[in-house]
C-alpha cells in the first residue's frame, strides 16, 4: 500500500532553531526558542510588542549572534555566521521599516536584490514577475524609491528580496506600510 502523504523524513526542515537565546547587552530578548520550517510551509511568529519576534529574525539572519542554541538552514549550521554568507545560502530577511535605497530608482532597487545572481535571463524574467505582482512598481520603475508611498516602499522591499530568488524569505512586519 502506498501513501501520498509526505513524512518529515521526506521533507526535512529547511530552517531549524534549537534552544536559541539572544540578548541586547545584559538584557535577554529571547530564550529557549526552538522551531522548524519545512519546504512549502508558511510559518508565523506571533506575539505582542517587545516579545522578541524581530530578535528571532535578526538572530536567524546573522544580524544578532545568539548566546546559546543553534540555527541551521538547509542542514548547514549558520549560527553566528556573517549575514552576507547567510544571504548567499538563499535566506533573505526583509526587515521592518520599508528598507529601500531612497535615492535609487525602483528598477535599480530591484536589481540590487539580484546582485548575487548570474543568470541574466532569470533576472529579467523575475523582474517581469515582480511587475506582474505589483504593477505600480512597473509604472514607477524610473522614479526614486524614496518618493514612493509607505505601502509602495514595502512592496519594493519584498520584491527586492524576491529578485534574489531565495529559498526562504523572513518578513518582519510585512503589512507595515
What are these regions (language model features)?
Residues 46-48:
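The feature captures the beta-strand-to-loop junction immediately N-terminal to the Walker
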Residues 165:
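Conserved catalytic motifs of ABC-family nucleotide-binding domains
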Residues 25, 43, 81, 106-125, ...:
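ABC-type ATPase nucleotide-binding domains, specifically the catalytic core motifs of the NBD
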Residues 144-148:
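Conserved ABC ATPase signature
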Residues 61:
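Helix-to-loop junction immediately C-terminal to a conserved catalytic motif
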Residues 69-76, 89, 123-127:
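Conserved ABC transporter NBD signature motif
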Residues 161-162:
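ABC ATPase C-loop
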Amino acid at each position: 500500500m502506498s501513501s501520498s502523504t509526505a513524512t518529515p523524513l521526506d521533507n526535512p526542515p529547511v530552517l531549524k532553531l534549537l534552544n536559541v537565546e539572544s540578548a541586547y547587552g545584559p538584557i535577554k530578548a529571547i530564550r529557549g526558542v526552538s522551531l522548524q520550517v519545512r519546504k512549502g510551509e508558511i510559518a508565523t511568529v506571533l506575539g505582542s510588542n517587545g516579545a522578541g519576534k524581530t530578535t528571532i529574525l535578526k538572530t536567524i539572519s546573522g544580524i544578532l549572534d545568539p548566546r546559546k542554541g543553534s540555527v541551521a538552514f538547509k542542514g548547514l549550521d549558520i549560527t553566528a555566521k556573517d549575514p552576507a554568507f547567510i544571504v548567499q545560502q538563499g535566506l533573505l530577511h526583509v526587515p521592518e521599516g520599508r528598507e529601500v535605497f531612497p535615492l535609487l530608482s525602483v528598477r535599480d532597487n530591484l536589481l540590487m536584490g539580484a546582485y548575487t545572481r548570474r543568470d541574466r535571463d532569470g533576472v529579467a524574467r523575475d523582474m517581469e514577475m515582480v511587475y506582474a505582482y505589483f504593477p505600480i512598481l512597473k509604472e514607477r520603475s524610473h522614479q526614486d524609491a524614496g518618493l514612493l508611498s509607505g505601502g509602495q516602499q514595502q512592496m519594493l522591499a519584498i520584491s527586492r528580496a524576491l529578485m534574489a530568488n531565495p529559498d526562504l524569505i523572513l518578513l518582519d512586519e510585512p503589512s507595515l506600510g
